[in-house]
């Protein structure tokens, strides 16, 4: 059966129902175009719903000059925040070589500038989104703290803070004692913190649900449990063959399927080299939990209050396309958090989760045009929620013929270090 999604003249077909695809659909509808979202699901494995729940403008890219000296440690130590278990994989080897090329001071500086500009666009739009969606979006502009226990962690945090100031983001520094005065949950071993004033926290699943609801209210269409198996271009536009046997068609198409974009990108004339980076979270019921979202500097763990529960999230595990929960990684996650929050030892575990983040070797997302009438938006790594509104703006501006900013050109398909 063929469904003519282009029956509405300016309707756009969006492959991918994570936060990036949803925000593109929302932006299209707000600017007078139509949108049909094809969402493969299921919800419970989506990194858009299981991430740390923090909007972190100016967050650094994964490749940095600090990574290469730790490379062997990352491969051999299962407790490393970025763990790369050795396995025979030519795509992984190529990715690692390209990743190593990205771990230079010059590329890090350029990436920080680009991610900072993109996240600034997003942050401004989150304020408007919070007003539009109301309490259902759970967007709380309460700031996010960066907390450390070691002198090395402090130096690392202060270097990133310098970058944030250059990019125009505000911060507030606290001693460990000041932090504990504000929030007694933190350990006596904590030496200090920086509060990122532009940070926000949220329940990412609730945000996705609120945006989905708004898409429907604006006249958009959302197909759930609808996996796209192939894409082709015909004389009348783009056609997506789905697992249900239906063919969805439209004059324009956006591929925003996260790590699953790899297999479809060639159909729109784009090559994207990504690796699935598995992340984990635990949901806890913890007495006297911290009240502000935080990133724990040394173990690279995110802590986010979500209603009566606390989300503990983190780790990057390059172990291929699978959703196997690795107990050792969960233990590492909780041990890292417990060093900062002693009360976690008596917390009740309510849920555990893992999902696959789409990570490029460059550390930058891929945002731009494919073959005529097609666009791609993927590779956001851990920053899908943070960068989604800005990504949607770049895609829709380009679709409507508005000039792209010079700094965003490095995000186009085919960019290399």
Predicted regions and their residues:
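N-terminal Rossmann-like FAD-binding beta1-loop-alpha1 element of flavoenzymes
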Residues: 10-37
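Glycine-rich FAD pyrophosphate-binding loop
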Residues: 30-50
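Active-site substrate-recognition segment that forms the wall
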Residues: 40, 51-55, 59, 63-102, ...
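C-terminal catalytic lobe of FAD-dependent flavoproteins
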Residues: 298, 341-417
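Core beta-strand elements of the Rossmann-like FAD/NAD(P) dinucleotide-binding domain
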Residues: 8-10, 243-252
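A conserved short coil-to-beta-strand element within the FAD-binding core of flavoproteins
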Residues: 174-182, 200, 224-238
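Rossmann-like flavin
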Residues: 94-213
């Amino acid at each position: 059966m063929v469904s003519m999604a282009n029956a509405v003249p300016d309707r756009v077909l969006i492959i991918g129902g994570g936060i990036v695809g949803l925000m593109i659909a929302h932006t299209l509808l707000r600017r007078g175009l139509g949108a049909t979202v094809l969402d493969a699901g299921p919800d419970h494995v989506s990194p858009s719903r299981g991430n740390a729940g923090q909007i972190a403008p100016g967050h650094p890219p994964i490749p940095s000059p600090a990574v290469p000296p730790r490379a062997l440690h990352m491969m051999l130590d299962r407790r490393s925040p970025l763990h790369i278990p050795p396995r025979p994989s030519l795509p992984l080897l190529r990715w690692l070589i390209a990743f190593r090329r990205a771990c230079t001071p010059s590329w890090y500086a350029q990436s920080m500038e680009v991610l900072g500009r993109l996240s600034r666009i997003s942050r401004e739009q989150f304020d408007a989104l919070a007003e539009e969606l109301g309490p259902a979006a759970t967007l709380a502009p309460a700031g996010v703290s960066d907390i450390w226990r070691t002198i090395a962690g402090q130096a690392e945090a202060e270097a990133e803070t310098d970058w944030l100031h250059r990019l125009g983001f505000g911060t507030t520094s606290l001693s460990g004692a000041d932090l504990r005065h504000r929030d007694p949950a933190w350990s006596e071993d904590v030496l200090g913190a920086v509060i990122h004033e532009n940070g926000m926290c949220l329940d990412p699943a609730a945000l996705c649900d609120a945006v989905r609801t708004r898409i429907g209210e604006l006249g958009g269409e959302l197909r759930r449990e609808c996996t796209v198996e192939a894409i082709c271009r015909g004389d009348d536009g783009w056609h997506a063959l789905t697992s249900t046997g239906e063919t969805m068609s439209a004059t324009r198409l956006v591929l925003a399927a996260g790590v699953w974009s790899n297999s479809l990108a060639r159909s729109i004339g784009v090559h994207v080299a990504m690796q699935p980076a598995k992340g984990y979270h635990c949901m806890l019921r913890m007495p006297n939990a911290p009240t502000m979202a935080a990133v724990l500097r040394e173990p690279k763990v995110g802590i986010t209050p979500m209603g009566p529960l606390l989300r503990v999230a983190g780790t990057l595990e390059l172990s291929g396309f699978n959703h196997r929960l690795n107990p050792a990684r969960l233990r590492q996650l909780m041990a890292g958090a417990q060093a900062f929050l002693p009360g976690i030892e008596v917390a009740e575990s309510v849920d555990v989760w893992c999902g696959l983040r789409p990570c490029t070797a460059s550390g930058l997302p891929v945002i731009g045009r494919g073959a005529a009438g097609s666009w791609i938006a993927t590779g956001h790594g851990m920053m899908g929620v943070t960068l989604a509104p800005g990504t949607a703006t770049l895609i829709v501006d380009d679709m409507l013929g508005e000039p792209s900013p010079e700094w965003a050109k490095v995000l186009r398909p085919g960019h290399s270090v």
